């Protein structure tokens, strides 16, 4: 188990800044649907001009995704990681597991990973591990229902819609269970937290403590890109982001080289491969 984690930190460019100089990643945009509404999120499926999560130039079917992997590897052999990060939530889409299985059958040595809100993570971990997934990223913006209610418009779970504190509490419970189980199963776990000034900036310390206790290995504080219901907010200045990362480092290691990748990102982080 420790050897698997060590390999992830040597070769996964999102888990290691050193690895980002040597290895690349390829995101497969096969997951359009989502099961929560984040107030900072707008998803675009035919966008070639924005470099941020939730956008892609086009959606792919699982078969198209496999062909895309073959084409990209033919011209960029430094790709070590195949990830699914949207443009919706991977675990809200059946195509995610189908795609991962297809890719794993053809390219078993590549690292497979997903980025998810965590609502359905725990129950899907056995299938994900069977499909070759070795790393997961879970976006955790709040561990307090009071704070979470300001960030999430709704949570859709098992054919019911949960709003306000009830939705935020349900989401965090699922995230905690998923992070803990993933870590126990030997997966590398990174947590993304969007820094939203005036909403959760004073709360991220509690988030860091909670996700580290759950078993997460790494945390990535992502500055808000004002969109959606939060379009009127200002993004946090770089100095604030740096101070918060410094404050949280003694609790959990911090990722500091994030490029806020698109759902169809390809190439090397350190060479601007968006």
Question: Where do the language-model regions lie?
Answer:
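N-terminal [4Fe-4S]-dependent radical SAM core
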Residues: 1-29, 43-58, 71, 75-78, ...
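Short, small-residue-enriched loops and turns at beta-alpha junctions
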Residues: 58, 88-92, 196-199, 227-230
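A C-terminal junction/extension of Radical SAM enzymes
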Residues: 186-188, 237-274
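Conserved AdoMet/S-adenosylmethionine-binding subsite of the radical SAM
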Residues: 91-222
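Short pre-active-site segment immediately N-terminal to redox-active cysteine/selenocysteine motifs
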Residues: 33-37, 45
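Short Fe-S-cluster ligation motifs
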Residues: 64-85
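Short glycine-enriched, charge-decorated loop/helix-capping segments at active-site entrances
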Residues: 52-57, 152-155, 164-165, 233-236
């Amino acid at each position: 188990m420790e050897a698997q984690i060590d390999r992830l930190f040597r070769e996964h460019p999102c888990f290691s800044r050193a690895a980002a100089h040597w290895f690349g990643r390829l995101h497969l945009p096969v997951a359009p649907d989502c099961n929560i509404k984040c107030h900072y999120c707008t998803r675009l499926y035919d966008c070639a001009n924005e470099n941020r999560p939730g956008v892609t130039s086009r959606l792919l079917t699982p078969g198209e995704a496999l062909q895309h992997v073959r084409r990209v590897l033919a011209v960029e052999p430094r790709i070590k990681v195949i990830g699914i990060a949207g443009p919706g939530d991977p675990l809200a889409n059946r195509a995610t597991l189908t795609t991962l299985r297809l890719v794993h059958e053809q390219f078993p040595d590549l690292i497979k990973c997903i980025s998810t809100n965590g609502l359905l993570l725990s129950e899907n971990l056995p299938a994900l591990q069977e499909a070759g997934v070795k790393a997961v990223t879970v976006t955790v913006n709040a561990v307090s229902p009071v704070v979470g209610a300001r960030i999430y418009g709704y949570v859709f779970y098992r054919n019911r819609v949960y709003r306000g504190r009830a939705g935020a509490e349900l989401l965090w419970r699922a995230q905690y269970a998923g992070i803990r189980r993933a870590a126990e199963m030997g997966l590398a776990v990174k947590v993304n937290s969007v820094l939203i000034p005036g909403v959760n900036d004073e709360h991220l310390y509690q988030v860091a403590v909670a996700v580290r206790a759950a078993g997460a290995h790494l945390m990535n504080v992502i500055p808000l890109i004002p969109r959606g219901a939060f379009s009127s907010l200002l993004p946090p200045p770089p100095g604030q982001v740096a101070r918060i990362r410094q404050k949280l480092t003694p609790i959990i290691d911090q990722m500091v080289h994030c490029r806020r990748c698109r759902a169809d990102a390809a190439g090397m982080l350190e060479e601007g491969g968006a």
